[in-house]
């Protein structure tokens, strides 16, 4: 069963919603104080609207992984241009074009079968073709599947710690 990586097209919204809801259930089970299962009401239609609105945007990337005619996963990313005044910043990478992965989700039944790898490698190739010097993404720090995938399989390194505090 091979995976095909392609831009999303009309009709993919239902499959994208299915994968997103599955990811929500997985993460809500890991940490219910932080994650929730998204509302399914109108979700497929929301994905369809996003497909129509952003399919040909220059600095935004949307990819779908298809296996046997079904959406198996998807990825969204965007380019960030060098920051104004980057020479005055402490962080060197602010002077670079950066590929920011906003979301990468794969149907749980297809984990460890190359779908996430194919999506992320396609995004990296897209970024290289647009002069990106690095890729950045974030994931749940205690994710037992995602963290090893990024660090051990894909060669990503932890670069910072993200803090949060509820107010009220």
Protein language model features and the residues they cover:
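A short helix-loop-beta-strand connector motif used in the catalytic cores of GNAT acetyltransferases and
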Residues: 48-63, 82, 100
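Conserved GNAT acetyl-CoA-binding A-motif
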Residues: 120, 127-139
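Conserved N-terminal entry element of GNAT/NAT acetyltransferase domains
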Residues: 1-14, 18, 22-25, 29
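Conserved GNAT-fold acetyl-CoA-binding loop/helix
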Residues: 21-50
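Conserved acyl-donor/pantetheine-binding loop and adjacent beta-alpha core of acyl/acetyltransferases
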Residues: 76-100
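Conserved beta-strand in the GNAT
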Residues: 64, 70-78, 100, 105
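Conserved beta-strand-loop-alpha-helix junction that forms the acyl-donor binding cleft
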Residues: 111, 137-146, 164-168
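Conserved acetyl-CoA pyrophosphate-binding loop and the N-cap/start of the following alpha-helix
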Residues: 110, 114-122
């Amino acid at each position: 069963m091979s995976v095909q990586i392609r831009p999303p097209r009309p009709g993919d919204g239902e499959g994208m919603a299915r994968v997103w809801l599955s990811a929500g259930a997985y993460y809500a089970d890991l940490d219910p104080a932080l994650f929730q299962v998204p509302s399914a009401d109108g979700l497929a239609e929301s994905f369809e609207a996003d497909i129509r609105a952003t399919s040909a945007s220059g600095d935004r990337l949307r990819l779908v992984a298809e296996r046997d005619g079904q959406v198996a996963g998807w990825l969204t990313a965007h380019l960030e241009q060098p920051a104004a005044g980057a020479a005055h910043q402490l962080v060197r990478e602010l002077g670079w074009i950066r590929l920011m992965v906003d979301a990468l989700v794969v149907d749980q039944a297809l984990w460890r079968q190359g779908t996430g790898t194919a999506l992320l490698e396609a995004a990296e190739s897209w970024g290289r073709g647009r002069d990106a010097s690095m890729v950045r993404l974030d994931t749940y720090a205690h994710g037992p599947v995602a963290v090893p995938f990024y660090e051990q399989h894909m060669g990503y390194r932890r670069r910072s710690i993200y803090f949060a505090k509820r107010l009220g």
